[in-house]
C-alpha cells in the first residue's frame, strides 16, 4: 500500500511540475506596411503610435513583422522591453524591408539566428524564380524562455506578391530549411504568404504536415474576420486570408484571432495582425 501511495504522489508531483514548467506565450504576425509618403494620411508617421499601442494592449510576447524598414522597427523598439532579429532584404544588413522578429528581451534569450532569401541561391540577397519586384527573405531564430528554460524556434517570412512560381518554390524552400534547422523541436512560423489557403503554395505546406495551421487547431472559435488584408479600408471585403501563424505539433493553441482594431476610423496597417495564445 505504501508503494501505491508513493507512486500516486510521484505522478501528482510530475503533473504539477509539468504545469509549472509550461510556457504560455502570445505570438503574432503583423505586416506593418512599408513607410511611403504615397500612403498620405495612412503613412507610417500617422499610424506608428497606433501600431505600438495595439502591440502593447494585446500583450504580444513575440511577433513576426513584414515590410518594416529599420527606422520603423526602431520606432517599435521605443517600447523598452522589445528587441529584434533580422536583416534588410536588399543587402543582408540594414537596407530595404525586413522580415524581422520582434521579441520581449526581458523574457527570451536568442541562442541562434539566421536569414535566407527566397531565391535559387538562398545565401545571398536576390530575386527568385519569376519574382520581378523585390528580394524576399526569411529570418529565423532559436529562443530560450528564461523562466522555464524551454527552447523554441521562430521563422518569419514574406513571400512574393507577383510570381506564382516564386511563391510555390518559396514554400518548398521554407519546408526544406525548417526540417534541416528545427528537426523535432518546438517552433512557430509566421508570415505574409501572399497566398490564400486553397492556393498551390499553401497546399504544399498543408500536404507536407510539418506546419500546423493555428487557426484550424484553436481550442476556441477563431475571432475576427476571415481575411487579413484590408487595403486601409474599413469597408473592404476582408475575405483574403494571406497572413498565417503555423505551429509544431506539440504546441497547444488556446485561441486564434484576426485583430480588426481601428481608431477614429483609421486602421494601423493595410494588414490586420493575426494573434494566438499558445502553450507548450
Protein language model regions, located:
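N-terminal, active-site-proximal structural segment of metallo-dependent hydrolase catalytic domains
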Residues: 2, 16-79, 90-97, 172, ...
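Structured beta-strand-rich core segments of catalytic domains in phosphoester-bond hydrolases
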Residues: 62-151, 257-258
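Metal-dependent phosphoester-hydrolase catalytic domains
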Residues: 107, 165, 169, 176-187, ...
Amino acid at each position: 500500500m505504501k508503494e501505491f501511495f508513493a507512486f500516486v504522489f510521484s505522478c501528482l508531483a510530475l503533473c504539477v511540475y509539468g504545469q509549472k514548467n509550461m510556457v504560455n506565450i502570445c505570438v503574432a504576425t503583423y505586416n506593418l506596411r512599408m513607410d511611403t509618403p504615397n500612403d498620405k494620411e495612412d503613412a507610417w508617421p500617422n499610424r506608428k503610435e497606433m501600431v505600438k499601442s495595439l502591440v502593447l494592449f494585446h500583450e504580444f510576447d513575440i511577433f513576426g513583422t513584414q515590410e518594416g524598414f529599420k527606422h520603423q522597427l526602431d520606432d517599435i523598439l521605443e517600447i523598452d522591453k522589445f528587441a529584434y532579429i533580422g536583416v534588410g532584404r536588399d543587402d543582408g544588413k540594414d537596407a530595404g524591408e525586413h522580415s524581422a522578429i520582434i521579441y520581449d528581451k526581458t523574457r527570451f534569450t536568442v541562442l541562434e539566428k539566421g536569414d535566407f532569401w527566397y531565391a535559387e541561391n538562398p545565401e545571398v540577397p536576390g530575386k527568385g524564380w519569376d519574382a520581378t519586384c523585390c528580394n524576399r527573405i526569411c529570418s529565423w531564430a532559436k529562443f530560450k524562455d528564461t523562466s522555464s528554460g524551454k527552447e523554441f524556434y521562430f521563422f518569419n517570412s514574406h513571400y512574393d506578391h507577383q510570381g506564382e512560381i516564386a511563391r510555390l518554390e518559396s514554400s518548398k524552400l521554407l519546408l526544406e530549411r525548417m526540417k534541416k534547422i528545427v528537426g523535432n523541436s518546438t517552433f512557430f512560423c509566421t508570415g505574409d504568404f501572399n497566398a490564400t489557403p486553397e492556393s498551390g503554395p499553401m497546399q504544399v505546406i498543408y500536404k507536407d504536415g510539418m506546419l500546423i495551421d493555428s487557426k484550424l487547431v484553436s481550442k476556441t472559435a477563431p475571432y475576427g474576420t476571415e481575411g487579413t488584408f484590408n487595403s486601409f479600408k474599413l469597408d473592404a471585403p476582408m475575405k483574403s486570408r494571406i497572413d498565417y501563424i503555423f505551429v509544431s505539433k506539440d504546441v497547444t493553441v488556446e485561441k486564434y484571432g484576426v485583430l480588426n482594431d481601428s481608431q477614429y476610423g483609421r486602421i494601423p496597417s493595410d494588414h490586420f495582425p493575426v494573434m494566438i495564445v499558445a502553450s507548450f
